[in-house]
Amino acid sequence: MEFVEFSEVSETTKTSSLPQGHEWTVQVPAGSKLTVIVKYGIAEILGTELANDVPYTFQGVIVNIYAIERSMIEWKCLEELEPKVSENKSYHAYIYNLNFALERLRLSSFNGPRVLIVGNASTGKSSLAQMLCSYALKIRHYQPLLVNLNPQDGVFSLPGSITATPISELLDVESSIWGQSITTGATKLHNKQPLVKNYGLENIRDNRPLYLSTITQLASGVQQRLKNDPIVRRSGVIIDTPKLSHLDTEDWSEVGHMIEQFDINAIVVCAESDDLAIELSEVFRTKIGSIVRIPPPGSIIAIDDIMRRALQRVQIREYFYGTTETVLSPYTMGAGFEELTVFRPRNISEYGEDKKDVDLTVFDKIEVNSSNLQHAIIAITNISRKESQDKLNTASIIGYGLITEVNDSKKKLRVLLPVPSRIPDRAMILTEYRYLE
């Protein structure tokens, strides 16, 4: 008999030296874990400074470490990664100048800047939004309101939602959703409390009226927060938007709606040339005081559909289970079919030639069964399931659940919840997102 020997796969620690103004960039596969330690120097991830000799762990994300001064990092990963180091000093000079310009606006008025960031895919929009919030915290005791209007990204919530979150402390650089909201376990950083509105569909084109309605509801909550909180009002609002290919760029209806609802006074265009900034200045010349262009950073890694799906899966898992450093303990609860009332948003692709006569902002009640709900993500609203269906349009989201098992014969199902609770007696909205453990 022959015995087969299995060689143990070990992680080899590698080092990278980063000159001042250079950025270390790597894409971490979803199934791999990268650990990074800054040995000396000052380095940051999207505006958040990394402590020396502290391990940071990343899974399924793109990591960008920028050296403010000469730095040395140690890193290890079982997967063979190919990080690249590029000079990025000029890009950060743009960011610093923009940050100082926003600070002047904060000092000149009790109403802080309201910035809308627009651009095509892979131009650094989301990274810019995160950096502007992080840099604001370094200047004074600000609490900028970070707004995400891209339903394909999970920001302090799950994909399918749009959110508004006051940022009062450091963002969690290890988290794929930028940090934890109210969760079931202890976290290293202060939990954020986002205002969450559910869109539920994957693509904006599938229901533009519902998307605009959802923006209106989120903006209403934002305006109320700004009215009641002078610190947040003076700190300003930083808004990240979907990539332009998902928006109507013929008459700019969605961008115009965002400008109107959030009282935008500045637009930041992430683009290689001035063409987009010039077009927007012509369309919105009477509404916007200033439009500036920021060129994309040279360290951008394009996110394709496969990576987007993998990242969304990481975000869903992290919402329920936490990160490798902050493990959460979700709860699985059983329930009968009769205990759930579930609605779903309408999709324009289902209506064919009759779509002009359909109210796409209405939600349809669905049957509770395995074909509809198996492995589905559901949004739990703040309204009773006995309330009028009309109130769904203005409902906020108190959390999300994952339907892990549906038994049609016994009319029973199991729901994974992030907090210990019975099945909430609330109306629920089915999203298009699924997660199979």
Swiss-Prot record:
Residues holding ATP: E23, S122, T123, G124, K125, S126, S127
KW Nucleotide-binding (keyword) present: yes
GO biological process: mRNA 3'-end processing; tRNA splicing, via endonucleolytic cleavage and ligation
Gene Ontology terms for molecular function: ATP binding; polynucleotide 5'-hydroxyl-kinase activity
One Pfam family from the record: CLP1_P
Keyword set, alphabetical order: ATP-binding, mRNA processing, Nucleotide-binding, Nucleus
Compartment(s) of residence: Nucleus
Gene3D superfamilies: Clp1, DNA binding domain, P-loop containing nucleotide triphosphate hydrolases, Pre-mRNA cleavage complex subunit Clp1, C-terminal domain
Keyword Nucleotide-binding applies: yes
One CC-aspect GO term: mRNA cleavage factor complex
Biological role: Required for endonucleolytic cleavage during polyadenylation-dependent pre-mRNA 3'-end formation.
UniProt subunit comment: Component of a pre-mRNA cleavage factor complex. Interacts directly with PCF11.
The family this protein is said to belong to: Belongs to the Clp1 family. Clp1 subfamily.
Protein name: mRNA cleavage and polyadenylation factor CLP1
